[in-house]
Every structure is written in C-alpha cells, then in structure tokens.
C-alpha cells in the first residue's frame, strides 16, 4: 500500500511540474533585443537595395542607445510622484 501511494504521489508531482512549467513559459517578460542579434541582421550579404550601402559598427549602436533616451531614469521631485494608477494628485 505504501509503495502505491508513493508512486501516485510521484506521478502527481511530475504532472504538476510539467503543467506549471508550461504556465511559466507563457508568463515570461520580453526583453530588449541585444546588440548581437542586431549585428546578425546587418551582416547579411544580400542587400534589398544594392545602390544603398549600409555600414554598421557595434559601437554606433551602443552610442545611439545611450543618446536615444536620456530621460528614462529621471527622478521625480519629492511629493510629486502620482503613484500606481493615478495620473495626477487630484483624485
């Protein structure tokens, strides 16, 4: 009787593990593309428009990324943070 209970418990555990693993895969966060993925796109040997020449350097992508969003992590003044779900302090 004890061995049967153990095998049922083990089976239920592995079944739950498989089901929960599927849920975890659907709840993941999409991250930004890395410069290595972008580098692969630009290094294609075929060009859509052969008259246009595109040069790509990894340093250029990193510099654009820094300059593109300079105010992303700007602190707010004390007392002026709207909080979650509020666009202003008049609620």
Swiss-Prot record:
GO CC list: apoplast; extracellular space
Swiss-Prot/TrEMBL induction comment: Induced by auxin and nitrogen (N). Induced in shoots in response to nitrogen and nitrate starvation. Also accumulates under osmotic stress (e.g. mannitol and NaCl).
Leader sequence residues: 1-28
Propeptide feature ranges: 29-71, 87-91
Region (Disordered): 69-91
Listed GO biological process terms: cell surface receptor signaling pathway; cellular response to ammonium ion; cellular response to nitrogen starvation; lateral root development; negative regulation of cell division; negative regulation of cell growth; nitrate import; nitrogen utilization
Keyword check for Secreted: yes
The record's account of how the chain is modified after translation: The mature small signaling peptide is generated by proteolytic processing of the longer precursor.
Hydroxyproline, modified sites: 75, 78, 82
Keyword Signal: yes
Keywords: Apoplast, Developmental protein, Hormone, Hydroxylation, Secreted, Signal
Tissue: Mainly expressed in the lateral root primordia. Also present in the shoot apical meristem (SAM). Detected in the primary root apical meristem, at the root-hypocotyl junction, roots, leaves (in the small dentations at the leaf margin), siliques and flowers.
Domain of life: Eukaryota
GO molecular function terms noted in the UniProt entry: hormone activity
Function recorded in the entry: Extracellular signaling peptide that represses, in a dose-dependent manner, primary root growth rate and lateral root elongation by inhibiting both cell division in meristems and cell growth in elongation zones. Also slightly prevents growth of above-ground parts. Regulates systemic nitrogen (N)-demand signaling. Mediates systemic up-regulation of genes involved in N uptake and assimilation pathways (e.g. NRT1.1, NRT2.1 and NRT3.1).
Family that this chain belongs to: Belongs to the C-terminally encoded plant signaling peptide (CEP) family.
Complexes and interactors: Interacts with the CEP receptors CEPR1 and CEPR2.
Protein name: Precursor of CEP1
């Amino acid at each position: 009787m004890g061995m049967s209970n153990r095998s049922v418990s083990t089976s239920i555990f592995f079944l739950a593990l498989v089901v929960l693993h599927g849920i975890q895969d659907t709840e993941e966060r999409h991250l930004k593309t890395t410069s290595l993925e972008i580098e692969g796109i630009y290094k294609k040997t075929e060009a859509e428009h052969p008259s246009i020449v595109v040069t790509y350097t990894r340093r250029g992508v990193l510099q654009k990324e820094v300059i593109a969003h300079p105010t992303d992590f700007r602190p707010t003044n004390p007392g002026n943070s709207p909080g979650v779900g509020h666009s202003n302090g008049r609620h």
